[in-house]
Amino acid sequence: MTYVYAFDHPHEKPPMSLKDLLGGKGANLAEMTSVLQLPVPHGFTITTDACRAYMGGRPGGGPNEPGGWPAGLTEEVAARLVELETSMGKRLGDPADPLLVSVRSGAKFSMPGMMDTVLNLGLNDESVLGLAKQTGDERFAYDSYRRFVSMYGRIVLGLPAEPFDAHFDKARERSGAENDATIPADALADLVEDYKALVEHHTGMTFPQDPADQLRGAIEAVFRSWGGARAVAYRVKERISHDLGTAVNVQAMVFGNRDDNSGTGVGFTRDPATGAAGAYGDFLVNAQGEDVVAGIRNTLKLAEMQRLFPSIYDELLAIFDRLERHYRDMCDTEFTIDQGKLWMLQTRVGKRTGGAALRMAVDMTTDERMRLTHAEAVQRVTAEHLEQVLHPQVGGGDVQVIATGLAASPGAGVGKAYFTADAAAEAAGRGEAVILVRSETSPEDVHGMIVAKGILTSRGGLVSHAAVVARGWGTPAVVGADGVHIRGASFEAGGVTVKEGDVISVDGSTGRVMLGAVEVTVSEPPPEFDTILGWADEIRAGKLAVRANADTGADAANARRFGAEGIGLCRTEHMFLADDRLPIVRRMILADTAEDETAALEELRVAQKADFYEVLEAMDGLPVTVRLLDPPLHEFLPRTEDLLVRASMPAGLSEEERRLLRAAEAWHEFNPMLGIRGVRLGVLKPGLYAMQVRALMEAAADRVAAGGRPVVEIMIPLTIGREELALARGWVEEAVARVSAGVDMTIGTMIETPRAALRAGEIAEEADFFSFGTNDLTQMTFGFSRDDIESRLMPAYLEQGLLKRNPFDTIDAAGVGELVMLAAERGRAAKPGLKLGVCGEHGGDPESITLFHAAGLNYVSCSPFRVPIARLAAAHAVLSGRAPGS
């Protein structure tokens, strides 16, 4: 097995197709070098195979138990290093003219800022003198060395950043320098000694001087960073597999910190926030790449390069054009100017906001250089992009703006200010809405950024760590708000002091920071939103419909506005919980005689009829699936514990409360999820289901009389066998016969127990349709109680790799998904025309929708606000090429 490839290695396939092996950064560096022949510093890539071997190569090894340095890797790295030295005419560690390299991570999927980078590797106490002599610039040499010692100490040796930062600040103050670029050489040389002393104090060892030891240490650090807490947290959030590993890229250094004819920057071929055509980005003069994203200095706009470096700016724009033509997408780049020479250090398809993704996708269908098809444009937009454009925005009304910064990630965020990632995470764990406030963020802050409703930094630009991560996650963010002066757990801005726990608001669309909680409104999607969804609907038409879960006329009308093609789940129990209905339900439960029960049911029938009428009216002409009562009756009664507490008080219980207590005790269940609910409740109280069916059919008849076209589907919950469904079907048909409605009506059942899935062939004989209730099917298949395991057990299972996905968010393909496939196959074998749908929360999850399409389902159903996401995901599923039933 080959572990190391030079950037210019002649691969049999296009390098950009080898991201599994080379990682995204390595594949694109090879593509730019060997295919596009852009100015890229020479280097080589250590593959993801090597990382996986290192992380889990020993027997029993795993992500938290390193397998060790792979056999043969040392020799391969040495061979590629000799080639690199030959091509550059320099040798690593040469005291007279040293080659310096960067060591960077590069996983298959972009994980900006989550893993580690080491720059200027190869410097030591001797080679720094050679670098100073060769360049004639002692300041540059020691600036590079102090950066290397600091990075190596933090990333490879695991030292905290704060002591390095403190020494740096002291050096700058002592020298009277305005910023890092003006600290003189002698102060930087002293700073190197301070840094080395820090390393020895914390580790008990002197700073490594052998470049070979430095290189191996840096490679291992990048491997280890794949299993680091921030990278794991990012992958859990982004649903990236822990098994992929990261590649490592070793590349000859070019220097943006050499002089004022040098610089470094991050550039996008289009605006990643709005999608507007034209170059976009930030850069710094006399700086190294990490300075731009770290927010150490506020950056210059890319357009400023036209004034400072006009010929290089033109060259960069020409490269941007070539990259867009080649990748047929917006690209994110990193570049360095080394004494007037432009070098490209990285490119990748750039992360973007939801609005930008929509605009780019539509624009690129008419861009002569790209000519995307409608299908390609639809595939460029993700579910997360749609969610972002539906993000809340700052509404009307007076607001108190206390500072402004750069609008880094759109949307409105409201919450309590917290000044460390740990404090933010703790507050979010208590259920508080949090705004994370930092001078600048770093990868160590990820656990606080994940839970934040908004992010505010006082330093940094639009390509800083905070901006890039927030845009990728759709978290509102304002960065570079230099009017915000942070002092410990408070900040001052606009004459106001904001302390930890005070409520502030950030507007990532305008850059405003506001005191207090602002009014938040639902945003208006851009016109491209409807364009993309229209194309998505054309792609999935006749293959996979999208319905909504809605319980009221207002919900149904809202769902229809979002493009729902019917109601896949109308939960009748929600109609019972209204303040004016609950007393009637309790009278029905407490009834001592059949007459009393019938009287209560009659009152409920009248109320439910009105509810059903509103839903049928909103969905006129489209199918409405009504699930008969599902939860156990004790959910409509007061809690036994509350009644017992009141009974112990001097006033005691009223007569009605005593009756409620007896009923609550009678209907109490130790495991309600597996108790008397669904069709089992109908067996004990058949009059309840008969009442609901009559109310529904009478509402449908009234709709017909009013000129409507109701399409009714009656669904029996929680059946486990044919006999049970046959009994329930009899109740329904008897009730329907009492109402001459002239209405299209079918009767089906939910498949939500493993037994029902296994016996689907028999159940299909009594059903016109199946709807998979994947919430309960997941609970019963795993033996998980969702309410009990999601807050404590699930995070541990995900972080330790025991589960790759939360099965309540994305369907478990190997278990629950297989039951869905099996039930669909057996049901259709018994009844070829059987309609199949899903109404659990998985119906709005893109990955789950792909499985449902493959299983041959006719529709998915989800909450109204996820209907647009499901429409897009259904089109993606159709375009994936996985045929139904495969």
Predicted feature locations:
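Short secondary-structure boundary segments
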Residues: 44, 481-482, 517, 774, ...
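Extended, non-globular alpha-helical segments
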Residues: 404-444, 493-531
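Structural motif
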Residues: 249, 418, 435-439, 456, 458, 480, 549, ...
